[in-house]
Amino acid sequence: PNLTEACMLTGMPYREDGWSKADFLKMTDKLRELGADKIVISGLNSTSYITNVVSETPGEIKFLRQKRVGKVRSGTGDIFAAVIASDCVNGYPLENSVKKAAAFVRDCILATEKRDIPPTDGVCFEDVLYRLKV
């Protein structure tokens, strides 16, 4: 889930910032109680970076950062999740998949900005789809 969805699922109050590692450990514990095994909390925004929280083992989390590019666009979360889901069914390691998905979304945003597409029209993933080939 993204942060908003994770808050809704766990009953934790949403806030824009001020999240600690302990907060995310608590959140991933609550998501595990709901049946999740491996967890990605996507799209934590800061001025310069997008961060994804990854937890494959109870009590452990990693923060994977990607340089922020372009405008906020519709559909990026769906693309991010689709790359991870595809890799998951193909046995690809989760941490590597999250890095791959974040890089792919970044490339989609850059390709879309180049075409001057309005942010509400999503992203031009077709231009960079070939980069997902294994």
Where are each of the predicted segments found?
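Conserved phosphate/ATP/ADP-binding segment of small-molecule kinases
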Residues: 1-61
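Glycine-rich beta-alpha junction loops
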Residues: 5, 43-47, 67-70, 101-106
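Short, small-residue alpha-helix embedded
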Residues: 8, 71-94
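Generic structural signal for well-ordered, non-membrane alpha-helical segments
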Residues: 20, 24, 28, 73, ...
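Phosphate-handling active-site elements
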Residues: 60-62, 87-101
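Short pre-catalytic strand/loop immediately N-terminal to key active-site residues, enriched for Gly-Thr
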Residues: 61-75
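Charged C-terminal helix
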Residues: 95-134
